[in-house]
Regions:
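Hydrophobic beta-strand scaffold residues
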Residues: 44-45, 139
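Compositionally biased, low-complexity intrinsically disordered regions
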Residues: 199-201
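Generic N-terminal amphipathic, Lys/Arg-enriched alpha-helix
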Residues: 1-22
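Hydrophobic packing residues in well-ordered alpha-helices of helical domains and bundles
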Residues: 6, 27-30, 56
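A cross-taxon signal for low-complexity, glycine/charged-rich
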Residues: 207-208
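A short, well-structured juxtamembrane/interface segment
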Residues: 19-40
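Glycine-rich phosphate-binding loops that contact phosphosugars or nucleotide phosphates
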Residues: 52, 57-189, 193
């Protein structure tokens, strides 16, 4: 056995994580914007294939449930999780339409569609991105190395510079958690403001109002 070879996975992750740190500001901004939109009644739609589908569902679970501290639930849907709709659409319209048709059904102007793909080239995600932009949704993506077609099809993309799909997916999970942390931070800040008592009018103001 070669210990160095078995540690290569960790070495690849460490190297990619160092480059990934520059993405922190993007995730913080996304989390804040998402908190504002979902807090105002918008919803998040998320989609991915294979391992990326699992990551997508992880994100929606954190938002509908909770990430760390208790807070109200927010509307977030993982499109692949509705297996009956997904298989029916694939059977009747083709696999390329499984996410686009659901985006058309559930998406509204002002909503956010987040797409996860290690390759950045999945046809069904590209179709969903086009449909979302037609509707007036904002489209974000987590992908593998740039450039890639999905990056070009979205409003904004965070592209992980790592050659292995496994490493990309691992950093996508980091991105999901950082996004949720920023989301919760903004939610807590807004809740703190709403809990503050309204300032009492000064005696002078009360007296002037009585005159």
């Amino acid at each position: 056995m070669n210990p160095t070879r078995h540690a290569q996975h960790c070495d690849d992750l460490t190297e990619a994580l160092a480059a990934f740190r520059s993405s922190c500001s993007v995730l913080h901004r996304w989390g804040g914007e998402l908190a504002g939109r979902l807090g105002g009644g918008a919803r998040l739609l998320v989609a991915g294939n294979g391992g990326s589908a699992a990551q997508a569902q992880h994100l929606t679970a954190e938002l509908v449930g909770r990430y760390r501290e208790d807070r109200p639930p927010f509307s977030a849907l993982a499109l692949h999780a509705d297996t009956s709709s997904t298989t029916a659409i694939a059977n009747d319209y083709g696999v390329q339409e499984v996410f686009a048709r659901q985006t058309c059904a559930h998406g509204r102007p002002g909503d956010v569609l987040m797409l996860l793909s290690t390759s950045g080239a999945s046809a069904n995600l590209l179709s969903a991105a086009a449909e979302a932009r037609r509707i007036g949704m904002t489209v974000w993506a987590l992908t593998g190395p740039a450039p890639n077609p999905l990056e070009a099809a979205c409003d904004e993309a965070l592209c992980v510079a790592a050659p292995a799909s496994a490493t990309v997916q691992e950093l996508h999970l980091v991105a999901v958690h950082m996004l949720c942390e920023a989301f919760d931070q903004v939610c807590e800040e807004r809740a703190s403001v709403s809990r503050r008592p309204s300032p009492s009018p000064s005696p002078v103001a009360v007296e002037r109002g009585a005159l």
